[in-house]
Each structure stands twice: as structure tokens, then as C-alpha cells.
Amino acid sequence: MNSIVQNISLANLSLAFIPVLVVIAIIWRWNMGYKTTIYAIFRMLVQLLLIGYVLTYIFETNSNYIVITVLIFMLLAASWISLRTTSLPRKTLLLNAVYSIVLGGVTVLLLMTQGVLSLKPWYSPSYMIPLGGMIFANCMNSISLAAERLESELKQGHPYEKAKVIALRTSLIPITNMLLAVGLVSLPGMMTGQILAGVSPLIAVRYQIMVMCMIFGSSGISAAVFLHSVKDSFTETKNRFE
């Protein structure tokens, strides 16, 4: 297959904003507060442009220390953001979130990069950082959903063990839906990107299977570890509600 990636000109890229402008117009017409949406889009553009330059620098330097530093920063950011859905102080649960993502995310990242892919060098930036980002982001989402649902169930008076099970089930809904839909409803990002880059669909499928297993495993482990480790903190909160 042709391995040359088609370059997107800025003029052509601007066409991608047409549906975005349509949604902004709808939000404005319905008095939903369009400024937040515009800010989010602007922030997305700035963040992606910055990460483009940062990744270019990282890939060129090819330093294991820089890769590890970036992964640690991503892990800490994911841990902090994951706690925004709970009313408890983030500082109270931050170590639990970090611990959960390390066990669920870092271990799975190492298994995939060193076992499945057998990277050489082991810290290859073009693999470690994108895969780490995927894993940490999904761990973040699963913990966030689990924390929000756990607190909600405890407020309703459910015992912790029952609330924990409901919270874990809730946290796995998005990734479970993704497993059911992949190949039927959607072609996930990595697979689509590889096919567009000219990689054989059969090879792209193998990578996507790895990614789906990696996301499901890391999300489930992180959420389960988090729910197990925060029992004391949330039990105290439950007692205040009673």
C-alpha cells in the first residue's frame, strides 16, 4: 500500500471548522453560553499546536529521561483531573488516584511496549508517549466516573460494597460500548490513522486489538484499585450524609 501520508494544507484544514461553527451557532441561538465552547475550541488548538512542537523536540532528542519526565507529568495530570467529579478535596484522594493509575496504567503500558511490541530502545518516544497518553486518559475517565457514581450511591444510603460494584460497572460502560462497537460502528483512531498512512488493514487490526485490550485492562484495573483504596475516605463522607 502507499505509505505516503497526505499533507493537509491550512486552507483545507479550515474546512474542518464548518461543522464546529454550525454547533456554535446552535449553542448561541439556544442561549447555552457559547463562550465556554469557543474557549474550549481555542484551548484545543493551542494545546495541540504546543504538543506538536513538544513531540517534535522529544522525538529528535530521543532521550529516555525526557520520555520518563513527560510520562510522569501526564500521569500526575490525569490523576488530578480524574478527581474533579467528587466533592471531597482532591488532595485527600490524589495519592489514591496516582497509585491506581500506576498499578493499572503504567504496568499495562510496560506490558504492551516491552512485551507485545518489544520496543528497541525500550523508551521509544513515538510509541511510549502516544500509548501512555491513551492509557492514562482512559484511566482518568474510569476513575472519574467511578468516583462520581460511588459518591452518588453512598448519598442514597447504599452500603459501600454495593456502591463500589455499581461504581465499577458504571466506569466500564464507555469502554464496554467501545468493545461492542469497534469494527461495526466505528474504526478507532489508531486504526484509522494507520490505514490513512498506508499500513495494511490486517496489520492495523493487530495494533487496534492491542489498544483495545490495553484500554480495557488499564481502565478496569485503575478503577477497581481506586474504589478499593478510597473506602475509608468515602465511608467518612457517607457517615456525614446519614
Model-derived features: where do they sit?
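N-terminal transmembrane hairpin
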Residues: 2-119
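Juxtamembrane helix-boundary/capping and inter-helix hinge elements in multi-pass membrane proteins
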Residues: 30-32, 152-161, 196-202
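Membrane-spanning helices that line or support transport/gating and their immediate boundary helices
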Residues: 37, 41, 142-149, 153, ...
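Membrane-proximal helix-loop-helix units in multi-pass membrane proteins
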Residues: 110-159
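Pore-lining and gate-forming transmembrane alpha-helices of multi-pass membrane transport proteins
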Residues: 129-133, 203-224
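Alpha-helical transmembrane segments of helical membrane proteins, especially in multi-pass transport
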Residues: 138-148, 152, 161-193, 222
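Glycine-rich helix-loop "coupling/hinge" segments at transmembrane-helix boundaries
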Residues: 185-211, 215
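Hydrophobic alpha-helical transmembrane segments of membrane transport and translocation systems
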Residues: 214-242
